[in-house]
């Protein structure tokens, strides 16, 4: 018989019997002093933590970021210097589904990256799409509510989704991507990733540049049709997890080409679009993507819960040489992501091993739930405030960003006034070939099943402003799929409104 470790309680005491509860007599009731049973049941009651409010269903892996290009003239970030190799963690996800949702659903895929750099953790928290549904964070909770379950029926509501989208024309770009082939990828090895937001670079000379990050899959793109996805879900709800885990276990390491688009700081005032608008892309003809490196995933987690479910990504985690921008959605996420982790994982969530930086950490935060580092991180128990005379940690002036020029009156500006929400979706639509357009029309028609006619007509009006062919194609697909025709509900509502 081989030597095996002794089973103990969480306090370290050996357990004599893990098969039978302590009872008063063979048939008698269980005794309250059976602490082993109480401990076991209590731990089971607390095994589940709150799932993420968004992006709950996810898949993760470790890897390496290798920089092969030279953008040192734009940024001082050590992680982006030529030849740098940085360990990292990636977590992919769906947006709307809960932890038990099927993987093969039509949805945006989250693309969250944590780079363990020598200057601290750098998190890039993006999606597999370069744009998003809303541009003002005040509307983000409302949008997410439409993707979740109806409070009365507890069912997903196509009516809520299309009602919100049809009242929010800024969503057209993302909706078009979502309903296209790329809205239903076969897995996450065959998708692109995007930082989506506009970030900034700054160099040793104090010069600032605006930047967008792209991760282009080197495996090619693969997508399901709706019918194919239904068959996949009938076989397995874990198709993406199975694919990613198996590929890495078999040594088929997925790779992404890393690119950046760089815009001189003053160009932001010259572009015909707002370069900080999350519903817009930067045309590649104006700001060509620059190849800077390769991201490879090459190791599976040993424990999903501790290394993927406990992973906490936040856009607030940046390093010297990388900064933020006036992107309103980014500004809100800087706060909301870290705050969500404090709620879901605890005050000191960054002490969880998967979230710990690889460099030394020194700060004056103290006490609180989950404090496992001895009170303070200053290295001296007498230095628990700042400034102090007891060799506590001090600032590093070289990490200061260059000043950002901001002007304007404080107000709640209508973000739809003077904003063109149709040109970029039109450019995307015109890139589709005939077969891609037909699938787009069919996917939209399928997603509109059961939606009231007046909402359908409102959305069709937006599609027509993108391109008459877009509106006509969806209208025909609706008739073919559901027998939808000239809508009397919409007409009656217009008459009522006029009266």
UniProtKB/Swiss-Prot annotation:
Its main location: periplasm. It is found in: Periplasm. It catalyses: 2 H2O2 = O2 + 2 H2O. GO terms for biological process: hydrogen peroxide catabolic process; response to hydrogen peroxide. Belongs to the catalase family. Transmembrane segments: none annotated. InterPro entries: Catalase (IPR018028), Catalase_3 (IPR040333), Catalase_clade1/3 (IPR024711), Catalase_core (IPR011614), Catalase_haem_BS (IPR002226), Catalase_immune_responsive (IPR010582), Catalase_sf (IPR020835). Residues 7-23 have a biased composition (Polar residues). SUPFAM superfamilies: Heme-dependent catalase-like. GO terms for molecular function: catalase activity; heme binding; metal ion binding. This is Catalase. The active site is at 55, 127.
